[in-house]
């Protein structure tokens, strides 16, 4: 019955069931769609705008939360029970694991540092028209050392793995040919990081540098 209702509404919108399935599967598989990421995600994001209500109804059955940033054109989904800034909490659901593996401690440290650096650039007006912030890898390493007393991995393969993971989460972007050992290497921090690391965590990190308690709780 539910499928019949969806099929009927899709027909009215001129969207095929395969196109709808492609969109939903991509959202569940990747957890995020960023219109600026690629031609594929541009197409899927635009399709989402056509079927927003249907996708929300469909995923609400699974108690999946959808966060849609219309300004920077990205969608991120969260599992049932996840605490999401700006979205109501589900107090009656104990499930709180992600669709994919949670970030490692090292990844969390990099993410927190990126969030602080993004906030600094935002306050200084050093954000481009797409809401992105350019940061040299060397600058990230220094900031991470100063803020959290941690270092980026010395092994290049481990360092690349972290950055690829963060790109998968649509938190950063970089040239595929980038070698992360060069002082001239740059990454682009994406605006979606503001929803990934909420204001409560940020307030403990910036401008107050007393982060020992936060590190013990998060890392």
Segment roles from a protein language model:
Residues 32-43, 125-146:
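Short acidic, hydrophobic short linear motifs in intrinsically disordered regions
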Residues 2, 9, 13, 17-23, ...:
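Leucine-rich, amphipathic alpha-helical/linker segments
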Residues 49-55, 150-168:
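Short amphipathic alpha-helical interaction segments
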Residues 61-68, 163, 167-180:
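A short, conserved structural fragment
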């Amino acid at each position: 019955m539910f499928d019949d209702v969806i099929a009927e509404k899709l027909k009215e919108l001129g969207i095929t069931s395969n196109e709808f399935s492609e969109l939903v599967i991509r959202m569940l598989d990747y957890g995020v769609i960023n219109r600026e990421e690629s031609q594929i995600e541009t197409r899927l994001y635009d399709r989402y705008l056509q079927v927003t209500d249907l996708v929300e109804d469909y995923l609400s059955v699974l108690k999946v939360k959808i966060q849609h940033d219309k300004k920077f054109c990205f969608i991120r989904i969260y599992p049932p029970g996840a605490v999401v800034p700006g979205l109501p909490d589900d107090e009656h659901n104990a499930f709180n694991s992600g669709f994919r593996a949670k970030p490692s401690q090292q990844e969390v440290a990099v993410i927190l540092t990126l969030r602080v650096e993004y906030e600094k650039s935002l306050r200084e007006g050093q954000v481009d028209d797409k809401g992105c912030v350019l940061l040299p890898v060397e600058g990230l390493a220094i900031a991470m050392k100063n803020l959290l007393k941690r270092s980026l991995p010395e092994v290049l393969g481990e360092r690349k793995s972290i950055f690829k993971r963060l790109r998968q989460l649509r938190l950063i972007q970089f040239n595929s040919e980038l070698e992360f050992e060069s002082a001239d290497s740059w990454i682009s921090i994406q605006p979606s990081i503001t929803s990934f690391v909420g204001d409560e965590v940020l307030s403990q990190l910036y401008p107050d540098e007393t982060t020992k308690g936060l590190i013990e709780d998060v890392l």
